[in-house]
Amino acid sequence: MANLCKRVVDLEKYIVKEAPPTVYYIPDFISEAEEEFLLQQVYRAPKPKWTQLSGRRLQNWGGLPNPKGMLAEKLPDWLLEYTEKISALGAFAGKTANHVLVNEYKPGEGIMPHEDGPLYHPTVTTITVGSHTLLDFYRPVCQAEPDAPQTEESRYMLSLLVQRKSLLILQDDMYKCYLHGIRGVCEDVLSEHVVNISSTGAQVGDTLPRSTRVSLTIRHVPKIIRANLFLGKK
């Protein structure tokens, strides 16, 4: 664990310069053995830990974010190892990640374009295991120009190829100003709009079949409520 946290990565080496500020993409952030370990831990979780949504299912670890404050719950050791590892990179400006959302996407499943919102420190970090995905980015609907085309296609900006074992970090404009989503398809055809393709070993025109992907979205929730305060104890 100590050796893990001592690992220092110069994030600037991994910045995706073709994207607006700021995207860091680190291929092979974890090993094959770590990937297998994480998958085992995810699927060992008790059935009530899963929440089924349209197009995916998820596990929530660390508490339920709320505008009034998140009632903090201790993360399990298998997640603490990775929240500490990512926090040690400086991803959260010296703060420590305290929340993990585990999402499972089967082939053909996805999520509509959305933003993560103000409940979190304005950084989102994601470890991907099991399969790749293509993460698409969109400009928000423009209220000032109601007559302008507002379709997803017209607002589409770019994509990121997010591979197995990678770490993706989104900050600044890419977190605050744009929406991100995953199309519900069974395979991805890589186009010139995949701006991190040079970091992936893939090529424009490649067709990548999806299998089941598990993502660990690791974030810092600034506003928390300690359990003893919630229960009225001193």
Curated annotation (Swiss-Prot):
PROSITE patterns: FE2OG_OXY
Ligand binding (2-oxoglutarate): N103, Y105, R213, S215
Keyword Oxidoreductase found: yes
Gene3D superfamilies: Alpha-ketoglutarate-dependent dioxygenase AlkB-like
Family as reported in the entry's similarity comment: Belongs to the alkB family.
Cofactor remark from the record: Binds 1 Fe(2+) ion per subunit.
Species of origin: Danio rerio
Keywords: Cytoplasm, Dioxygenase, Iron, Metal-binding, Nucleus, Oxidoreductase
One Pfam short name: 2OG-FeII_Oxy_2
Function: Probable Fe(2+)/2-oxoglutarate-dependent dioxygenase involved in oxidative demethylation of nucleic acids. Binds nucleic acids with a preference for ssDNA or ssRNA to other types of DNAs. May play a role in nucleic acid damage repair.
Name of the molecule in the record: Probable RNA/DNA demethylase ALKBH6
Lineage, uppermost ranks: Eukaryota, Metazoa, Chordata, Craniata, Vertebrata
GO MF annotations, alphabetized: dioxygenase activity; metal ion binding
